[in-house]
Amino acid sequence: MKHTFRHASLFLVLAGAALLARAEEISVAVAANFTAPMQKIAADFEKATGHKAQLVSGSTGKFYAQIKSGAPFQLLLAADDETPARLIKEGDGVTGSAFTYAIGKLVLWSPKPGFVDDKGEVLKAGRFEHLSVANPKLAPYGLAAMEALKALNLADALQPKVVLAESISQAQQFVTSGNAELGFIAYSQIHKDGRIIDGSYWLVPARLYSPIRQDAVVLAQGKGNAAVEALTAYLKSPAAAAVIRSYGYDR
């Protein structure tokens, strides 16, 4: 019995060593709004598979430019569905690999309790100096924000107060630092485990902007990579879906 136990233990050790030997580290470009949930998903993924996902956060537009310039990313989690489709068309993404991993929601937010009402009337009142918005040329959430302002017929009136950020993450930083009293950001940035972290907000009605379908795509440098394939499969799993929903996204 002891002899059998020793053999079983040795098998488990060797199997674990083999798993670690096959484990890889991959480079993943992640849309700024999805940073927090992806950090959680990446940690769970590493525990489950041994593979490590090295995350780089930023704006989708900036990632597109970097990928076109040869940046060594193997997987892109974009903040839209157009960029992955474009990369596939241009030969920088793997055909058939794109899929929607999350559907985002836009909010108007301020860290000050009661500053933003639940109908967004604060925008019409205009009693603020600066409104933070991610650059619509770089960030899909910034484009959604401008679409919402146009739908409300407020784009022209509020344009002088708009402060453009490079990414949705920076748009939030402008508000938290006091450079803007309020700003348009992703719901996920203030939502965790079914509750709002702080401040006051208006959940912008989906009818005011185009759907924010966030797609992932395997990039040319990740084609055939076992770790990349494992991560894309994990992103589609119920475990990942639970994390994604806990941050306020739809699937």
Which residues are covered by each model-predicted region?
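Exported/periplasmic ABC-transporter solute-binding proteins
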Residues: E24-S57, G61-A71, A78-D81, A85-G91, ...
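Sec/Tat signal peptide C-region and signal peptidase I cleavage site
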Residues: L19-A23
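Active-site phosphate-binding/coordination module
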Residues: G96
